[in-house]
């Protein structure tokens, strides 16, 4: 079976936005106009095709990025719907990794919200070109030009409108296409499927000319030949303008900007045209960096059908009918269903039972998959998110994705003995799907703890236990993931010796313990010379320290951000062993930690609160009571915006308190920012309670 769509006519795009900007509705309309869904799914009635998990239907937010394939004007668009809630940034980060381009949806009233900034930063990090769609132009307070300004100020980007609205709020009827200099007016009777191309209304002609001039100027800057033409007063052709917009979009010096109202079926076709015209094909993005596992040298994977198969697993889902689905972005070559692939990250071979093209949650079996495609593999046992799948003879490891550590834990207790067994299996499956979700057992109590990125994240996990796995569980109070670190440098020696007849134990080490920059992690340096400790025992010292650092000396929390230098020691020909050096390393570390001024760290959250002015004083007072540090105060659309760092431990139940303090008019968002030192009086309480 030959490839149906040439590689240069494929677009892998994500739709990313703040919660409630209308992202799922936009995806739905794309599927409707490209002929995939016959009845448009509305988020309001919980029937959206993309939002297919039960919880998403209830909450009306998108949780897992469903990958869907659709066609528009001889192009294949692989659409990845990404969640807009802060607790799910891991999903967004994952999909950014495998996209070639993105559509950023903004609400014409709300503009640039905190989550939009996070998603924008992630797209910058992965170098993803994007176009902006200003949605909800029919809403009261809609203002396209306000959003344009906010993108400049808050996102430090260069938005270049390629169409501008005709009317706003209930008079919004269409857009002016600045490339063609025509008005496009949608027909309400056909649910926006038909539209008329007309002359620009006379009252908007001046504005259209002004914005067309800005567009042409931005385009001319992309190319010397175009610049000369522009400065010489010559008209640029439509083709030249399109070429210039695409060049600027791909090098990220400009962001094409469009508007519409997905809910009212206006502006979606022009958005699809822009996706095809301006976002990159897999052949137009930079080659993917990888490492040759044999030589550890850097290699580059070029997107093409030639060459051996290489792809990246970027998402795992459990499907009630098919079992485990592994979503893979194919970068090079092709693969047939039923064949074997090599997982170069795990050094294991796996058989691909079936290949599925996904349409939201309907599926189509395909025989083979080609470069540039996104496809679900069935039958992989050992592959996890971030693993590379490739041809064994031409192995490559594509760059890994980084996943954040959980900042919040909750104890879960199964209600019955039968639930106990099912719960272990279910949590294991959920942890495979979501690398930012962790499961652990608390040693002292034997309780199962689940960890994640926020309260909503864990609520949804518990909810899925109930619905998908039929496990009833009680949940405890949320617990914060504290850490410990040291503030001063100390040198210590420890001799571990048991020599009373028979085979003894002997390990003797000198270590230096030093604090490191926040967030820099653990470092072990071996400075042993002259063989005072044999080479084979040195990893044991490191291992002993790594085990001991899981339980800090203050309150048993993991110790972070420090460096250990092993610089001296001694050994015994007969009695020394790896075990003895492991114990010596562990004891030396514990003694050194006690003397190195240990302190407790807590997760600090970046909190942004939006409130009407009259509640501002109360909100700031409340944040101060929660040990918050206020960073800035801004105005946005008649509301006051307060930015602060607040300890996570003080933020439990904040949504309820904020609602009652502002009569339901305040909203907030928070995301983990960094670990900060706990004030000594509070640290003392935490330590006593923990040791209680």
UniProtKB/Swiss-Prot annotation:
Domain (tr-type G): residue spans on this chain: 8-283
UniProt entry keywords in alphabetical sequence: Cytoplasm, Elongation factor, GTP-binding, Nucleotide-binding, Protein biosynthesis
Binding site for GTP: 17-24, 81-85, 135-138
Localization terms from the record: Cytoplasm
Gene3D superfamilies, alphabetized: 3.30.230.10, 3.30.70.240, Elongation Factor G (Translational Gtpase), domain 3, P-loop containing nucleotide triphosphate hydrolases, Translation factors
Matches recorded under InterPro entries: EFG_II, EFG_III, EFG_III/V, EFG_IV, EFG_V, EFG_V-like, EFTu-like_2, G_TR_CS
GO molecular function: GTP binding; GTPase activity; translation elongation factor activity
A single GO cellular-component term on record: cytoplasm
GO biological process: ribosome disassembly
HAMAP family: EF_G_EF_2_B
Family in the record: Belongs to the TRAFAC class translation factor GTPase superfamily. Classic translation factor GTPase family. EF-G/EF-2 subfamily.
NCBIfam families xrefs: EF-G (TIGR00484), PRK12740.1-3 (NF009379), PRK12740.1-5 (NF009381), small_GTP (TIGR00231)
Function comment: Catalyzes the GTP-dependent ribosomal translocation step during translation elongation. During this step, the ribosome changes from the pre-translocational (PRE) to the post-translocational (POST) state as the newly formed A-site-bound peptidyl-tRNA and P-site-bound deacylated tRNA move to the P and E sites, respectively. Catalyzes the coordinated movement of the two tRNA molecules, the mRNA and conformational changes in the ribosome.
The protein, known as: Elongation factor G
